[in-house]
Amino acid sequence: MSLFDLGGKTAIVTGAAGLLGRQHCQALAEAGAFVVATDSDRDTCAAVAEALGKSGIAIAADVTDPVSLRQLADAVRSLTGRIDVLVNNAAINDKFENPAAALEDSRFENYPLEMWKRSLEVNVTGVFLCSQVIGADMARAGRGSIINVASTYGVVAPDQSLYRDPEGRQRFYKTPVYPTTKGAVLAFTRFLAAYWGGAGVRVNALSPGGVENGQDDFFVAEYSRRTPLGRMAAPTDFRGAVVYLASDASGYMTGANLLVDGGFTAI
């Protein structure tokens, strides 16, 4: 079990205030790492760090701003002297403020260019910049693990029938940008793994399945029905995978995509 021990290591988690970001922070801290919880909102990431006690700290940063990320990296190195793990978790998953307009706005033919550009900026450029700024420090140190959080929708296309209620009415469509950006994250993961393999930095992706989080009952039931394990994921279901990818337990693993999806992509 010592292979999973992260004692003495420093981990940065972006999007730390999100549903899964909080879990990633907790898992890494429980494995012994000192965790830097990073989010664009200072107050929310401070609340995450507070829950970690002495095992973590909050430093707000904008993943789309290289100056902000350099300040983050410098602050972490000044504090702990090292960066061992980077979890690129920050991402946008489209939500439509007006439920009445969601169906039409989410159609591919109507999908707003502004939403497309914003998701590309955060979900793809954000991963690129965090890896470029923070990962470059890891490469210079000759060690590290980068974990890019992707999605099953980076592997398979969205099943639009999941968003259809029991009366057969399409509530909305899963939009094109989330699968596109998560597919890009997987390609970028392979690129970076090959590029930094000789520098001692491992780069892997973690692709979570759908997480139960207050969705309509019909969606939860239908998603569970088409998943071999018969349920959606709980937010805690990815803790072990994050620790595994961050630790020496996955020491001969790079350029891989670890699917933790209850078998969703197996059928």
Task: Identify the function of each model-found stretch.
Residues F128, R143, R231-A266:
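C-terminal substrate-recognition "lid" of short-chain dehydrogenase/reductases
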Residues G197, R202, M253-G255:
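Short, small/polar-rich loop/turn modules that mediate ligand/substrate recognition or access, typified
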Residues L3-V36, L192:
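Canonical Rossmann dinucleotide-binding motif of NAD(H)/NADP(H)-dependent dehydrogenases/reductases
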Residues E97-F108, P112-K117, Q160, Y223:
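Substrate-binding pocket helix/loop in short-chain dehydrogenase/reductase
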Residues A33-A47:
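Conserved glycine-rich Rossmann-like NAD(P)H-binding loop of the short-chain dehydrogenase/reductase
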Residues R42-D43, A60-L72, L113, D237:
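The beta1-alpha1 cofactor-binding region of Rossmann-like NAD(H)/NADP(H)-dependent oxidoreductases
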Residues S131, T181-A184, T189:
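Active-site helix of classical SDR
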